[in-house]
Amino acid sequence: MGNRGMEELIPLVNKLQDAFSSIGQSCHLDLPQIAVVGGQSAGKSSVLENFVGRDFLPRGSGIVTRRPLILQLIFSKTEYAEFLHCKSKKFTDFDEVRQEIEAETDRVTGTNKGISPVPINLRVYSPHVLNLTLIDLPGITKVPVGDQPPDIEYQIKDMILQFISRESSLILAVTPANMDLANSDALKLAKEVDPQGLRTIGVITKLDLMDEGTDARDVLENKLLPLRRGYIGVVNRSQKDIEGRKDIRAALAAERKFFLSHPAYRHMADRMGTPHLQKTLNQQLTNHIRESLPTLRSKLQSQLLSLEKEVEEYKNFRPDDPTRKTKALLQMVQQFGVDFEKRIEGSGDQVDTLELSGGARINRIFHERFPFELVKMEFDEKDLRREISYAIKNIHGVRTGLFTPDLAFEAIVKKQVVKLKEPCLKCVDLVIQELISTVRQCTSKLSSYPRLREETERIVTTYIREREGRTKDQILLLIDIEQSYINTNHEDFIGFANAQQRSTQLNKKRAIPNQGEILVIRRGWLTINNISLMKGGSKEYWFVLTAESLSWYKDEEEKEKKYMLPLDNLKIRDVEKGFMSNKHVFAIFNTEQRNVYKDLRQIELACDSQEDVDSWKASFLRAGVYPEKDQAENEDGAQENTFSMDPQLERQVETIRNLVDSYVAIINKSIRDLMPKTIMHLMINNTKAFIHHELLAYLYSSADQSSLMEESAEQAQRRDDMLRMYHALKEALNIIGDISTSTVSTPVPPPVDDTWLQNTSSHSPTPQRRPVSSVHPPGRPPAVRGPTPGPPLIPMPVGATSSFSAPPIPSRPGPQNVFANNDPFSAPPQIPSRPARIPPGIPPGVPSRRAPAAPSRPTIIRPAEPSLLD
């Protein structure tokens, strides 16, 4: 016969477990451990066995449980047991389980009453149990026997405390009825770890072995030595019953008959016995499950909310709906167009704070990278002067010219304009790369439909490539237009007269320092990369770039200036990235081979990314610091020709040089303005319009709709998993709601005055016998409950001593007298209120037993009373 209450809980817990396992999680109910604590031969193992409903633990007289037994009950469809020390063997006969426990105990402790703290781990799989842990502990003893060590008492207590200290442990404090309750070590230990008494249940065993005429009624009614959760009396099988193979069913029937027939217990028979103990423990398990439900519910609700948004699109999913694929295709294409436009035009909705979007990158190309590429093709001064001198001489031919020729200016300008084609085409290529990258990022949302994604990328990329050709043609046309007519009447053009005076004005301007406010072009952190380790190694500084100088400071407060470097004769060159470095480096050097900083001919400045390097280079260009040119030509001849010019030719070269500078600046300004406009119109805006208006038609013509909208296996699995998870979460929440409504929590009993457990050191000499207490407790309960119970009770016992004090004493005079003095204020231990509660059926022979006990009372108790009162 199993534990019916526990079997009723099994479906409830299984529902929860199934609900959680369906969402791929485990339901951690963490049901309480049930630990049985008590003295030797108190009946601990029998109590535990009755709770499980199986006969499998060793029992007998003396110390039988000599190692802790950790019994794990695990719900399973088949019934068997296995030990941790021999996992490979499954026990289906529980007699063999008992024999294995005895054998394993002897293997570690020997056969001569030895004790070991090493636990035996037993797992019992059964369809009739919950997932619980039960602990059978060795009995508390004070005197070592056999192979037991001298400190056996402390060893056992430490062992017990390890198991019952856990907050979720229920403690069954087992005390036999024929022993002293006030000195119960089990209750004392429980009080240490559970001072509020919330998880301690008193269990009184061996009620059938009490002396005739004595009972434990007041203890079981929680009037004498009360506990918060009270006491439950049980009657276990005797050793004779066990040897006679009396099963648990018959034992429970005999127990019930005992309580119904006993005059002291029949009125509370429904609150006594193993079934009531099972019911009480099962109610504690129910309470624990209910207490766990709010945490589980909030956990499930948070998961459900996180899934709501993702599941919203799947809720109305109908695989057999003929319009489903059409709707999905339209929705996907529209979403792709919206995402593409947001990434290009920018949007305040869901801004990416980790990296630049496509539109921001294209903006950087237009206004940082492209101007930098234009300045990079800046002509070399010596080469330009040589070309101008050759042009002037070739135009004059054999004649000696008196005036500066216009044709030389036009020839040089046209040659410079042609050089603009390369940076302009490179700008288009950079924009195309960003557009294609943006398309791929936007199609990532189409990953559910691989064929649709592939076709969308192909069609849009093909269109961008088509627009690339037209855009490049248009840009080349712009350059050809600039080359076709040199407009020397432009309002920004300096003209011949101004060109001749420009050199003088520039020299004067350089001689007079700028008294106005210096314009700061850029600020930021840079690392000087080539300072030797001997001088501190590479270090990060705060750099400030103006139109005249480059300064660096210790930090961004700009209070402690480290150095200021004038920009005259400075240029930029690229530096290869170090093998072990993740920094991107460029260098600044002096064209006149002078040191730029201390003993360094160049300073290497490091940034975290190539984009930062390009941005700094563009800033240096604005300040007039240009990139280094490759000197592929023979400079010796150039120098000879340059320096061999006569003064008149030199003046003409200088004039044309200034005119070329002025006109090329006008063209650069125009190209810098027209390039972004041309690319935006011919490429970006056209691509957006194509996606919005024509992409869908191209998709329909490129492939069958069914093949386009075939889901990937991963996406179908993901959708199914998400929907299953969503419904499982809702089902689990419904189950939790059902459990909450179908079960009832038992309220915690109110606190009781259990100071007797704390004062047992002073009471311990007196109370020796609980059975007797049940005979004369009516006068004693007030003594325990009230703060000053003694005085009012003194007169009552005096009158009652002769007539009602004897019945409990005859069987064990000594212990009875000691127990009678549990109340230090009552000189005579018996209270006269008992007669009214004694059933009329008390045997007439009881009075004859009273006389022997009376003489022993003064001898044992009276000498101890004064010290107790003190």
UniProtKB/Swiss-Prot annotation:
Catalytic activity from the UniProt record: GTP + H2O = GDP + phosphate + H(+)
Impact when changing residue 597 to F: Strongly reduced phosphorylation. Decreases receptor-mediated endocytosis
Residue segments, region G2 motif: 64-66
EC numbers: 3.6.5.5
Annotated Pro residues bias: 826-846
Tissue expression pattern: Ubiquitously expressed. Brain expression is restricted to glial cells and fibroblasts. Highest levels in the testis.
Skewed-composition ranges (Polar residues): 756-767
Result after altering residue 231 to F: Strongly reduced phosphorylation. Decreases receptor-mediated endocytosis
Keyword set includes Cell wall biogenesis/degradation: no
Chain spans, region Disordered: 741-870
Primary subcellular site in the record, as a coarse category: cytoplasm
Modified positions (N6-acetyllysine) in chain numbering: 299, 598
Primary enzyme class: hydrolase
Region (G3 motif) residue spans: 136-139
Modified residues (Phosphotyrosine): 231, 597
Compartments, record wording: Cytoplasm, Cytoskeleton; Cytoplasmic vesicle, Clathrin-coated vesicle; Cell projection, Uropodium; Endosome
Keyword Electron transport belongs to the record: no
Biased composition (Low complexity): 847-864
Mutation effect (residue 399 to A): Does not Affect stimulation of GTPase activity by CTTN
Location of Phosphothreonine modifications: 755
InterPro entries with a match to the protein in the record: Dynamin, Dynamin_GTPase, Dynamin_GTPase_CS, Dynamin_N, Dynamin_stalk, G_DYNAMIN_dom, GED, GED_dom
Family matches, as PANTHER family: DYNAMIN (PTHR11566), DYNAMIN-2 (PTHR11566:SF23)
Stated role: Catalyzes the hydrolysis of GTP and utilizes this energy to mediate vesicle scission at plasma membrane during endocytosis and filament remodeling at many actin structures during organization of the actin cytoskeleton. Plays an important role in vesicular trafficking processes, namely clathrin-mediated endocytosis (CME), exocytic and clathrin-coated vesicle from the trans-Golgi network, and PDGF stimulated macropinocytosis.
Known partners and oligomeric status: Oligomerizes into a helical polymer that self-assembles around the vesicle membrane, when associated to the menbrane through lipid binding. Interacts with SHANK1 and SHANK2. Interacts with SNX9. Interacts (via C-terminal proline-rich domain (PRD)) with SNX18 (via SH3 domain); this interaction regulates ATG9A and ATG16L1 trafficking from recycling endosomes to sites of autophagosome formation. Interacts with SNX33 (via SH3 domain). Interacts with PSTPIP1 (via SH3 domain). Interacts with CTNND2.
UniProt-recorded name of the protein: Dynamin-2
